[in-house]
């Protein structure tokens, strides 16, 4: 399989060697190369597309999980934890290895022939190839609706070639500025490209005013109805279970209809917002009464309680509390600091040197009694002991006298979370989540 998956990246890596690393997506990415095949594979499908800066994966899983109670539902998400085929699912079941290999071989054969006609600085995106494979698989499985998650952006993301019935926009903030834009307005305009004329609706999570203004303007221009949380549907009840950090919510629609109580399967207040957004989307798609009836079924609530999304504030231990989250920027870390403001954690940060590790450490200071920076062995990401030296300089670290250190052996920190008597928080990129899964697998061999 590795030899086949190397073909996914061949065109991309060829072009990357001849491109300016600091250039934005609009100068490097070429979604028009995969658009014809994606549009052909997506023909006759009902598709829901999801973008934003935080919570794309969670809300994609929630929407798909609800829809698959009635519809055969395809799900395309990124990134994966251990296997690439985790990104492609039908009714939450991962694509079979034999089918994945067949689609990978056929699809890369087509695109590598196309690559031979391209200049050396122009490449085909691995995401475009995977999206083509996913849509072909969904067609083979005769899905009746698909949920597809964008990558970093929208305007130059290959997924944007997928015809969509509904768009979903999670909170947008400053992130991936090198690729998407230097200002929040540039990033919002990039992601607002999810809104296209002919769509039935677009749903938006809570946004800062500058972002919401851009989304409203785009929706008005494209003549697409925009449904906003807290305006067109809203949480009317929200209570936290202190032991688990999970929330029970109730959601009301604009016409006065209201769901019963639903316990969100993942901890964190933002997951309550994510699930409320999923309720808004699926209420529109299925019909409010049909959704409300489903949410009241105890059998559905039992199934929902077993839904897990690795790396999304994953609870590794309850006593003491040990949490792991794919958090690589300060904005995401602020959510955690607010959510657990009454606790103190030993915080492990595994964020590459070219990402916002300083922002993560600054935001998490209020709930940290110690910070340890570490690294993964993934060759595509750069980590350095110098990161700890930068964190030591932070005012919040100095004022609170928070010990900061660097530990190059991540496995030793995974082992520590098994034996620690103090709350622990592991924050980092998905390569950390993957490293944990691999460590856990070795431990149980």
Predicted regions and their residues:
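Short functional linear segments
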Residues: 1-52, 59-69, 76, 115-119
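ATP-dependent carboxylate-amine ligase catalytic core
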Residues: 36-43, 71-162, 178-180
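Short Gly/Thr/Asp-enriched flexible loops that form oxyanion-binding sites at enzyme active sites
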Residues: 63, 153-165, 437-440
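Beta-strand->loop->alpha-helix junctions that form or flank phosphate-binding loops
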Residues: 76-79, 204-206, 218-241, 264-269, ...
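Acidic, Mg2+-coordinating active-site environments of NTP-dependent enzymes
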Residues: 114-118, 141-142, 149, 164-261, ...
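Nucleotide phosphate-binding/pyrophosphate-handling subdomain across enzymes
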Residues: 145, 157-168, 172-176, 186, ...
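C-terminal helical cap/extension that packs against the catalytic core
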Residues: 208-227, 321-324, 361-423
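Alpha-helix capping/helix-boundary segments
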Residues: 431-432
